[in-house]
Amino acid sequence: MSGWMTRRHGLQALAGATLAAWSTPWSAWAQGAAAERRTSPTPRLVSVHSSLTETIYRLGAQDTLVGTDTTSTFPEAAQRTRKVGYMRTLSAEGLLALQPTAVLATDEAGPPVVLAQLRQAGVPVHLVPSTLRFDDVLAKVRLVAQLTGREAQGRALVAQLQAEWHAVQAQATSPATPSRAGAPRVMFVMAHGGGAMTAGRDTSAHAMLQLAGARNALEQVQGFRALNAESVVLAQPDVVLTTTESLAFLGGAERLWQQAGLSQTPAARHQRLLAFDGMALLGFGPRMPSVLTQLQRQLA
């Protein structure tokens, strides 16, 4: 923790030094952009996370969107919005060029110096904590509803999601549901452009498995790790969970089973493979309760 805090303080110091070094032309440009934003009759929002973008569309507030990050691929209309890059590697110039009245993001967004530049230019940056809990979903709905003036729609969506969430909890605690000791051992495998990875504790995949009442076959591992045959064979997963994007990248289910050690598992012998849209499964957005319901059914 102390190392993380040291890195964070270092980034904050860097942000301050960078802001102090801004040239007069940059400051003048930023002030001009801020003046144009103040005359905008409706919100001009940039959404930097798929879950926030989905929430904006669910509330019917897509007319307020002027840009999204590259994780925002659902609904399909979001793919046609102006893109500001990946959420962890944002550019102040690219964001400010869209003249946003606010930027919505999770606390995973960055780098910190860019967020500081946006605030210095007069653009409010709203960050939602990523705690990997259902509360994250509701916090995103409430923030979007407030910023877009869709409070009534927001309250309705919160009520709907809470009802879905209660159904998930009821299923997880049902006498018909196996106890944790008897729950299936599930291994999450992801390959979105590089080598295949598996997920241990403190990951969104681990959180979703716990919420669904399953056991993470790699719960003794911290974070994401490269898939390797030894750990897979030792874990002996009953089920492999992946994303549809991973299947597409690897070339289908047959190619996935050929990954390190997977062919030697109970999951491969019984061909128990589940695949979901990546951001629906891992993004903690408004699709989360329905995905958990599907996951529970398919694991039963």
Task: Describe each model-derived feature in a short phrase.
Residues S2-W4, H9-A30:
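N-terminal export signals
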Residues P25-L45:
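C-terminal segment of N-terminal export signals and the immediately downstream linker at the start
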Residues R38-R44, V113-M197, A214-Q220, V239, ...:
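Extracytoplasmic substrate-binding proteins
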Residues R44-L98, A102-V114, A253, L262:
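A short, structured surface patch at a secondary-structure boundary
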Residues H49, D107-E108, S130, V221, ...:
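Short secondary-structure boundary segments
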Residues A92-Q99, N228-Q236:
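Short helices/loops that flank or line small-molecule/ion binding pockets
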Residues A109-Q120, L241-W257:
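A ligand-binding cleft/hinge motif common to bilobed small-molecule-binding domains
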Residues A199-R225, T244:
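His/Asp/Glu-enriched short active-site or ligand-binding loop at hydrolase and phosphoryl-transfer sites
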